[in-house]
């Protein structure tokens, strides 16, 4: 199992002007960390986790039922997945829907006024990622 990425490294990766890259890559880091939690906490082989039949919904069900993930962290993961799906499956995603999803994201801590169109998204990805990494280290 590789060492988790630092928050600073993820922040640098998310510093892109390409919306599709931002939303797909941001979610990839979240889901990859979820995969590693499942491997470590439940001894699920990576071969099984990598199967297309092992969907994010199934992964989230396992983590939710076990009590590992709940509340705003769960909500953020679900919203990040919805945003990712819009960009992965539509040539021109509905910008208003994306804005609404981002508005629903939780900072998972205090936050000062954000600047930039997707600043809140970036902060929420990094903080959700950070919470998941802490879960992985327990």
What are these regions, as identified by a protein language model?
Residues 1-138:
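Amphipathic alpha-helical interface elements
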């Amino acid at each position: 199992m590789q060492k988790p990425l630092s928050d600073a490294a993820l922040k640098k990766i998310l510093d892109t002007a390409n919306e599709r890259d931002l939303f797909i890559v941001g979610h990839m880091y979240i889901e990859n960390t979820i995969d590693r939690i499942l491997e470590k906490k439940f001894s699920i082989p990576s071969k099984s986790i990598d199967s297309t039949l092992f969907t994010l919904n199934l992964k989230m069900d396992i983590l939710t039922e076990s009590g590992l993930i709940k509340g705003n962290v769960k909500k953020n993961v679900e919203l990040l997945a919805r945003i990712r799906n819009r960009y992965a499956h539509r040539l021109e995603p509905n910008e208003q829907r994306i804005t609404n999803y981002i508005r629903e994201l939780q900072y998972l801590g205090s936050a000062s006024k954000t600047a930039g169109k997707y600043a809140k998204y970036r902060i929420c990805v990094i903080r959700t990622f950070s919470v998941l990494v802490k879960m992985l280290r327990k």
